[in-house]
Amino acid sequence: MPKLKTKSAVKKRFKLTASGKVIASQAGKKHFMRRRTKAQIRNLRGTTILCPQDRYNIKKYFLPYGIN
């Protein structure tokens, strides 16, 4: 049986930590930034850890070898 391929889009958007958590960048920073306050823009920097249900879905359906 051939190896399962990882979805390319998921490879670019998410990373797995050593403990099995999924890291993603904050959503909502592409456009419409003028209407946001400086604090809102600042809080969108960096990355966030996905909630357990989203983590499960990403690992199960898109990262075939990501489930520990």
From Swiss-Prot:
GO terms for cellular component: cytosolic large ribosomal subunit
Keywords: Ribonucleoprotein, Ribosomal protein
An example Gene Ontology molecular-function term: structural constituent of ribosome
Taxonomy, superkingdom: Bacteria
Alphabetized Gene3D superfamilies for the sequence: 4.10.410.60
Pfam families: Ribosomal_L35p
GO BP, sorted A to Z: translation
Similarity comment text for this entry: Belongs to the bacterial ribosomal protein bL35 family.
Alphabetical list of NCBIfam families matching this protein: rpmI_bact (TIGR00001)
Protein name: Large ribosomal subunit protein bL35
